[in-house]
Each structure stands twice: as structure tokens, then as C-alpha cells.
């Protein structure tokens, strides 16, 4: 991919973040997400790429825009696959809480795992513990191997886990081992990235979250020379074996079979992101551990964007001031 595409993709996530911010704290996560989707799609279609959405808002019959298989861009230029999460943290945006982002990752054709929208167990570490993880082993054994690779006592490890009921036993186990636990309500893409940032205390992310977010995380973890393993899990194996959960879970397993993916099998990083020739962009909506959130005063808004180019392993933080009434008219309707 041409490196100048990176700045174009930063504009895409900025527009999505600004659109989501319009609905900040208003209690309507679906409207916020819809606005971000629309703004992201408009901006993507201005970029000189022949792009296909491979991780998006759902199937064509479930989502009007940015659905899996949708073509975006001008149709000219590099042929790329795109993984998007227009708002990573729709609930946080609706409730005015921290760590909401607009996110996208772009790679060469065939770069990303085409994962169904289901659950994924994830274990993620930074470069210092690369090669030290194996989801086939018990969690405690993994943590001891990670601590050994990082040359630190087990009690000095910092592990981030989503604060969900399904993780209560995991959090208790980690605390019993003496590990420091950061329990976050949502936002495992941001938490994944923190494992690889030189100024972050986070050593490990572990837990069960969304598979689409897992693939986005894999792209940036590969770009930053970290390591990750994942395992697709059906809904009834995560949320309880009710009739409804089993129906959804069986459908997920059927989708996996159709797509040639084996649920329950450990997926290595290079199976989820097959190249480090990726560009990743994330713009903060609300202030968080990774990025500052948007501040707005009248017609002006300030954003912070994390832009990562895997080929050169370059990390940029971009602070931008936007005069909203000078934006593309099609975007204005979603941000003003």
C-alpha cells in the first residue's frame, strides 16, 4: 500500500469519531453507531482504493452500510481489505464513558481472517513476550511463561480483563496469583494495543470478547511486533446454554463451517493477520487510556488519532483542529 494512504485513513476515523461524538451521552448507542457508520462510509468512498469490507457492521441483510463484502473507495488504486469498527464502545459513547474509539485497519487483499460475528477468547502480549503464549495451556502456565519472558516476577505482571460476569472467576484467579488486574468495562481493542505501547504498564490482555474486534486487534498487534492467539467460541459456550443462546450458537458454528474456520481451534496471529503491511487508524471519541477524547467548542473540534503503519513500524499521534462547517457537505450532516 502507498504510505500516503495512511493520512487518508486517519481522516476516515476522525470523521467517524466526530459523528459519534455528536451523540455522546445521549443514551442512544444505535443512533451514535449509525452516524459513525455513515460518516466513515462517505470518507472511505473518497479514497483512491479498491476496497472490500471484510470485518464490518454485519451481513448485507443486517446492516445498510459497511456490511461484510461491501465495496468502498473510488475503485482505483490499491486493492485492499478493510476491517472497521466505526465505534468501538457504543455503550461508552451513549453513556459518556471513557475509552470509546473509531477504528479501522487496512491490509493487502486476503490479509485478514474472515471471522463471523461471534465470541473469541484472546490472549495478547507485547514484543517482549512474543512466542511465550499458548492458549492450549492453562492461563496460570501462560502467565508464568510470560513473566519469565519479560524477566519479572509473576506478581509484577499487569493483566487487562473485560469486567464482565463471564470473567469473574478469571479475575479472582488472577488476583489470587498476585497479578495486578485492570478490569475495564468495554474496549478491548484499545486495551490490546496498550500491550505493545512502550509507555504502557499493560503486559497482557486476556478474556472473551468479539471476534471482529479480535481481528482488528490482530492487525495492529502484528504491525507492532506483539503476539496474539485467539479461539472462536459459540454463544451458548459463553453466555449459557439457553434455547436462544443455543440457536444463535449453532448458527455461528454453521457459519464457521461455511467459511472454512474451525471453532474452538487455536488461531495464531499470522492466521488472523497474514501480513504486517497494514495501516491502522484509531481516533478517540471519549478520553481514555490510549487516546484523548474529542473536545468541541462551537464550530471547532479537536481530535487525537493514533496512526500506525506496519511496514515501517511507525507510530504517529496526530492532534487535529477541525472547523466543522468546512467539512464535506455530506459529512457535515452527521457531525453538526
Over which residues does each language-model region extend?
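N-terminal subdomain of lithium-sensitive/metallo-dependent phosphomonoesterases centered on the IMPase/IPPase/PAP
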Residues: 1-83, 144, 148, 175, ...
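Oxyanion/phosphate-interacting regions
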Residues: 5, 194-336
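General beta-strand structural signal in soluble alpha/beta enzymes
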Residues: 53-57, 82-84, 93-95, 114-115, ...
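Short acidic, glycine/serine/threonine-rich loops at helix termini
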Residues: 65-67, 95-97, 115-118, 169-175, ...
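DPxDG-like acidic metal-binding loop motif
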Residues: 77-88, 92-111
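Acidic beta-strand-loop-alpha-helix segment within the catalytic core
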Residues: 108-183, 288-290, 304-334
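Glycine-rich ThDP/TPP pyrophosphate-binding loop and its adjacent helix/strand module
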Residues: 174-181, 188-202
Amino acid at each position: 500500500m502507498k504510505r500516503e494512504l495512511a493520512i487518508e485513513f486517519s481522516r476516515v476515523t476522525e470523521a467517524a469519531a466526530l459523528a459519534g461524538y455528536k451523540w455522546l451521552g445521549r443514551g442512544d448507542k444505535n443512533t451514535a453507531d449509525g452516524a459513525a457508520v455513515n460518516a466513515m462510509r462517505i470518507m472511505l468512498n473518497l479514497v483512491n482504493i479498491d476496497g472490500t469490507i471484510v470485518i464490518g457492521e454485519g451481513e448485507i441483510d443486517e446492516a445498510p452500510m459497511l456490511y461484510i463484502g461491501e465495496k468502498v473507495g473510488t475503485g482505483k488504486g490499491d486493492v485492499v481489505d478493510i476491517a472497521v469498527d466505526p465505534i468501538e464502545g457504543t455503550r461508552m459513547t451513549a453513556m459518556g464513558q471513557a475509552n470509546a474509539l473509531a477504528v479501522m485497519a487496512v491490509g493487502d487483499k486476503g490479509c485478514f481472517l474472515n471471522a463471523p460475528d461471534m465470541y473469541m477468547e484472546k490472549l495478547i502480549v507485547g514484543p517482549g513476550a512474543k512466542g511465550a503464549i499458548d492458549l492450549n495451556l492453562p492461563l496460570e502456565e501462560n502467565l508464568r511463561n510470560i513473566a519469565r519472558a519479560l524477566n519479572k516476577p509473576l506478581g509484577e505482571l499487569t493483566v487487562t480483563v473485560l469486567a464482565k460476569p463471564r470473567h469473574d472467576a478469571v479475575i479472582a484467579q488472577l488476583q489470587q496469583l498476585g497479578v495486578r488486574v485492570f478490569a475495564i468495562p468495554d474496549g478491548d481493542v484499545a486495551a490490546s494495543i496498550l500491550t505493545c505501547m512502550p509507555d504502557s504498564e499493560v503486559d497482557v490482555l486476556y478474556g472473551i470478547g468479539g471476534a471482529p474486534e479480535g481481528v482488528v486487534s490482530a492487525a495492529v498487534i502484528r504491525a507492532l511486533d506483539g503476539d496474539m492467539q485467539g479461539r472462536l467460541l459459540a454463544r451458548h459456550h459463553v453466555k449459557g446454554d439457553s434455547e436462544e443462546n443455543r440457536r444463535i450458537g449453532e448458527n455461528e458454528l454453521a457459519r464457521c463451517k461455511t467459511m472454512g474456520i474451525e471453532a474452538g481451534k487455536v488461531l495464531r496471529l499470522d492466521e488472523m493477520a497474514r501480513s504486517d503491511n497494514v495501516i491502522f487508524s484509531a481516533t478517540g471519541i471519549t478520553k481514555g487510556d490510549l487516546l484523548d477524547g474529542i473536545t468541541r467548542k462551537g464550530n471547532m473540534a479537536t481530535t487525537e488519532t493514533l496512526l500506525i503503519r506496519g511496514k515501517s513500524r511507525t507510530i504517529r499521534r496526530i492532534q487535529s483542529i477541525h472547523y466543522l462547517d468546512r467539512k464535506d457537505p455530506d459529512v457535515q450532516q452527521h457531525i453538526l
